[in-house]
Amino acid sequence: LLLKKIPMPMTLRSLLPTLIIPLLGVTAMGLIMVYIIGGPIAAVTNALTDMLNSLGTGNLLLLGIIQGCMLAFDMGGPCNKVAYAFALAAMDTGNYMVMGANFVGSITPPLGIAIAILVKKSKFTSSERNSLAGLLAGAAGMITEFAIPFAASDPVKVIPSLMAGSAVGCTVSYMLGLTIQAPHGGLFVAFAMNNPIYFIIAAVVGAIVTAALLVVLKKDVPAEEVEAE
């Protein structure tokens, strides 16, 4: 609004909505990230990295729980990225179990929601149920972000359910000794797994935990919404 009141040639004014305002907006957000938000985020990221490094792989049960919770908490955000970076660092040392757990913990959220929709569709709106194909594709391709809309619509119930499922999935992955010598790819890199059956077992167990919690915690949506096509 302020920019529209500033005198400027008509040739420039026509660029306001398509170029000038977006450019100024991106610049402002960049400055805020660097000089205001960036410091605290970096501090939290470093603290999380130090915590994972201190755990190492000596206590696999605790590592699986923490790693799974971090992967599912923000699904692509800082916590997720720290856990992924830790898995990449472990790969560099020849430890592929951490990446195996990372795969499982990343796949569990969309797969768990998909199972919950199949089991109890009355807990979900018609638009959410229509996301089933995308959730299954996200699970197959290790794209956790497909679960974000569900977490955003009901974070108090959905996020803890996703975290619990991923924590269980990661822990089962460590217990089975799953290793994956690939940085990403989901089911499409099954050839890089020491045992694809272990991968499926861990992912399904974690997803069932997520689905069960969602079915228990979420309330039924209005009947007319369930019946709507």
Where do the language-model regions lie?
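Pore-lining transmembrane helices
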Residues: 1-227
